């Protein structure tokens, strides 16, 4: 177990060391966040905070994984996929900065890139990385061979996870803190499965998030942007794919699911009844507008993330 902590520590240290120069570089680029006018009014003060900060933990994750993981197709695939989704986010963030608007890529452009990468990842996992096309149904012991439908499931999972993390990234330290616990859960799971490369990757991901929180917790000095949130979602989604826990991910990453459901329910309720279920969605804004300080909301959701991660691990033991 001590060996498994090395990737976490190395990624955290690299992220911490890179923080000051990367933040200075982003300020020189004037890569400030444009805040949406329809969000909580308290967030208007965050305008101008450097964005695209996800590159910080991405570098920490990459360095730690390459240094400590045995070189293999799986190691390289996890990094390439994570950076592929990060690149979509980087383009999106860059357009926001250049055009001085809260929206970057068009939705269909963003979604198209995510689906394409997801399909490629699904095929690669099935044919070249030894994952196969069988999914396991938790608790029941059932197995289901999807054959060539599996890449579709993989793409759906990756697109859903990346966008769920993106929705969760709405408060200082929220997405990074939640992903820290989900990544730790996957590190423990991969350790029990004897998947050494995934142990290193998952723990390095947790370490990168930990180091990033030093700069991202309230009041944040940098935001991860879509660069970071899409990368985190891809990393978690691919961990689920390669550990064959696609159907357990909604529990392990339960907070992501709650955030996404709150948005869906809000839209459906308003269209059907003209009323909103929540003060604002995603769910974290509901608590924020209810008078909770931002840090309290974040810590509450972190605690919920820990509970859900433990519940997911327990589910796999039944």
From Swiss-Prot:
- Major location (coarse): membrane
Its catalytic activity?
Answer: UDP-N-acetyl-alpha-D-muramoyl-L-alanyl-gamma-D-glutamyl-meso-2,6-diaminopimeloyl-D-alanyl-D-alanine + di-trans,octa-cis-undecaprenyl phosphate = di-trans,octa-cis-undecaprenyl diphospho-N-acetyl-alpha-D-muramoyl-L-alanyl-D-glutamyl-meso-2,6-diaminopimeloyl-D-alanyl-D-alanine + UMP
Give the required cofactors: Mg(2+)
Which is a Gene Ontology cellular component entry for this protein?
A: plasma membrane
The answer to keyword Isomerase applying to this record is no
Question: InterPro entries per the record?
Answer: Glycosyl_transferase_4, PNAcMuramoyl-5peptid_Trfase, PNAcMuramoyl-5peptid_Trfase_CS
Q: Spell out the subcellular localization from the entry.
A: Cell membrane
**A Pfam family:** Glycos_transf_4
What keywords tag this UniProt record?
Cell cycle, Cell division, Cell membrane, Cell shape, Cell wall biogenesis/degradation, Magnesium, Membrane, Metal-binding, Peptidoglycan synthesis, Transferase, Transmembrane, Transmembrane helix
**Topology term for the membrane:** Multi-pass membrane protein
| The UniProt record lists the keyword Cell membrane | yes
Family membership = Belongs to the glycosyltransferase 4 family. MraY subfamily.
Role, per record: Catalyzes the initial step of the lipid cycle reactions in the biosynthesis of the cell wall peptidoglycan: transfers peptidoglycan precursor phospho-MurNAc-pentapeptide from UDP-MurNAc-pentapeptide onto the lipid carrier undecaprenyl phosphate, yielding undecaprenyl-pyrophosphoryl-MurNAc-pentapeptide, known as lipid I.
Query: What name has this protein been given in UniProt?
Result: Phospho-N-acetylmuramoyl-pentapeptide-transferase
What's the encoding gene here?
mraY
């Amino acid at each position: 177990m001590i060996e498994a902590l090395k990737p976490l520590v190395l990624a955290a240290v690299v992220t911490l060391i890179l923080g000051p120069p990367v933040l200075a570089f982003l300020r020189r680029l004037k890569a400030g966040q444009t805040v949406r006018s329809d969000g909580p009014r308290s967030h208007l003060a965050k305008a101008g905070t450097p964005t695209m900060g996800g590159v910080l933990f991405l570098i920490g994750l990459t360095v730690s994984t390459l240094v400590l993981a045995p070189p293999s197709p799986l190691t390289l695939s996890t990094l390439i996929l994570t950076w592929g989704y990060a690149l979509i986010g980087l383009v999106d963030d860059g357009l926001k900065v250049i055009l001085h608007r809260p929206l970057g890529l068009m939705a269909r452009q963003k979604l198209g890139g995510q689906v394409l990468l997801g399909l490629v990842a699904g095929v690669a996992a099935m044919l070249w990385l030894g994952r196969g096309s069988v999914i396991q149904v938790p608790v029941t012991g059932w197995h289901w061979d999807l054959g060539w439908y599996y890449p579709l499931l993989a793409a759906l999972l990756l697109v859903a996870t990346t966008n769920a993390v993106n929705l969760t990234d709405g408060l200082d330290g929220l997405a990074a803190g939640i992903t820290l616990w989900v990544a730790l859960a996957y590190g423990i799971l991969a350790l029990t499965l004897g998947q050494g490369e995934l142990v290193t990757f998952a723990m390095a991901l947790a370490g990168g998030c930990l180091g990033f929180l030093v700069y991202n917790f309230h009041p944040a000095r940098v935001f991860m942007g879509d660069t970071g949130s899409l990368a985190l979602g891809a990393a978690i989604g691919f961990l689920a794919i390669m550990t064959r826990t696609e159907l357990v991910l909604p529990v392990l990453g339960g907070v992501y699911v709650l955030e996404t459901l709150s948005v869906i329910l809000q839209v459906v309720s308003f269209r059907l009844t003209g009323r909103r279920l929540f003060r604002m969605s995603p769910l974290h804004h509901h608590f924020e507008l209810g008078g909770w300080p931002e840090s309290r909301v974040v810590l509450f959701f972190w605690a919920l993330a820990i509970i859900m991660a433990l519940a997911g691990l327990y589910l796999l033991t039944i």
